[in-house]
A protein has these predicted regions:
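N-terminal nucleotide-binding beta1-loop-alpha1 segment
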Residues: 1-14
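A short, N-terminal amphipathic alpha-helix
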Residues: 25-44
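Acidic donor-binding segment of Leloir-type glycosyltransferases
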Residues: 43-67
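Short phosphate-binding loop-to-helix
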Residues: 60-95, 152
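Catalytic metal- and UDP-sugar-binding loop of GT-A-like glycosyltransferases, i.e.
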Residues: 98
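Conserved donor-nucleotide/metal-binding helix-loop-beta segment in metal-dependent transferases, i.e.
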Residues: 103-130
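Short, glycine-/small-residue-rich phosphate/pyrophosphate-handling segment
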Residues: 141-162
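Conserved alpha/beta core of the MobA/IspD/sugar-nucleotide pyrophosphorylase nucleotidyltransferase superfamily
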Residues: 161-223
Length: 223
């Protein structure tokens, strides 16, 4: 799931730390690395689900890397529902939905999530703040997401409650974190200094930002 990379419309919680232009450039890197991660999996179809108003812009930007599909309705819950509805039409049996907030997610986590769906109706990847970064299912369940998205502090609890109400078995992917606020960005930068290949475009952008910041502190450049 994604949005078109427009200033002031993406990763807004990073705005206190970065300029709108920097946030947008960072988001582009996240999206490119996430798309590369998805495409690195074997025998999968990759689609980007986005608001209808973003389809043309994203399609031009992505090119032939993936299909771009308009979600039905507004908000993250509608986006999640649209993911599973889209793939249900094509008879794909195991579907994983995630956004561009975790481009450094190990591919093994996605592979394990698909395997989990062999034994469960739903798979979910928890975050440490009560949300989730990934959700998968073997069929479309229109009421599973009912009004909330992935990032709220009670999102995971509500998702599990609805899964129980629908009598769906749930398996879990490894806990992980996504990039929402400045502390997440600092953590990501530290990890990518050690292993830049996990998200090469994002790692390169972060390194360039660090160089600019260092030049600014020494009076040899400016932000």
């Amino acid at each position: 799931m994604a949005k078109a990379p427009r200033a002031g419309m993406v990763k807004t919680r990073l705005a206190p730390s970065l300029s709108p232009e920097a946030v947008t450039a960072f988001y582009c890197c996240l999206l490119e690395d996430t798309l590369a991660l998805a495409r690195s999996l074997s025998d999968v179809e990759v689609a980007i689900i986005c608001p209808d108003s973003d389809v043309n812009e994203l399609a031009q930007w992505i090119g032939n890397e993936a299909s771009v599909v308009a979600q039905k309705g507004e908000g993250l819950a509608a986006g999640l529902t649209s993911v599973f509805a889209h793939f249900a039409e094509g008879q794909q049996r195991r579907v994983i939905a995630f956004n561009s907030d975790s481009p450094h997610l190990p591919r093994s986590v996605l592979e394990a999530a698909f395997e989990t769906l062999a034994a469960h109706d739903v798979v979910v990847g928890p975050t440490h703040d009560g949300g989730y970064y990934l959700v998968g299912a073997k069929a479309s369940h229109p009421t599973l997401f009912a009004g909330d998205g992935m990032g709220t502090r009670s999102a995971l609890e509500r998702l599990l409650s609805r899964a129980r109400a629908l009598e769906l078995s749930v398996g879990f992917a490894a806990p992980f974190y996504d990039i929402d606020v400045a502390d997440d960005l600092i953590r990501l930068a530290a990890e990518l200094r050690i292993a830049p290949a996990r998200a090469p475009r994002t790692a390169r952008w972060l390194k360039e930002c660090e160089l600019v910041a260092a030049q600014s502190r020494t009076g040899t450049g400016k932000l």
